[in-house]
């Protein structure tokens, strides 16, 4: 994509732009590529992309970006980047998951992380041992270690092949919130379900 292509997509109604996918591109270094080579972060063209996205009030998604890319964007962007569908390295140490440093930055800037339901992001254990309870435990950990305000659900249902073993599809997502009930306040559960993302979305788009 060129910057012109990005502008065309925005004109068509796109409101969230991820700077790269699993492979690095002209704009940014990806998390996967950074793990096997040099993490160059954001390119000069990527910095221009951030300027355009800021001008157009577009949410910048760093779910697939390297740590250096995330912090480069954080340094120059009017609004913090979001992790729309990621995991947590504390539980599964893979490049696509968020480090404590990234999570601390998300907390301090009022951004959010959407917890990905991909079993291989949640744990190294066999899928049969990865359940709704696994997701709940990670949400509770993040709520206590950082803040419940950073939390959302970033299921990635259209991008993953498998779900936790006791989930069949989107119809089972309410199980997560049922398990959270009583362990978090009603306000905090509503935040994970909708309110936190909506708050962040409107803060960037307004």
What residue ranges belong to the model's regions?
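Mid-to-C-terminal alpha-helical segments outside catalytic/metal-binding sites
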Residues: 168-206
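Soluble non-cytosolic domains of exported or imported proteins
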Residues: 44, 129, 133, 167-171
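C-terminal helix-coil-helix/basic helical segment that borders enzyme active sites and/or dimer interfaces
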Residues: 124-126
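Active-site micro-motifs of SAM-dependent methyltransferase domains
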Residues: 88, 159, 199
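Outer-membrane beta-barrel pore domains
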Residues: 128-129, 160-167, 180-184
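Extended, charged catalytic domains and RNA/DNA-binding interfaces, predominantly
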Residues: 1-116, 120-122, 136-143, 150, ...
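Conserved residues at the C-terminal ends of beta-strands
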Residues: 20, 154, 195
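Short acidic/histidine-rich active-site segments
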Residues: 117, 146-170
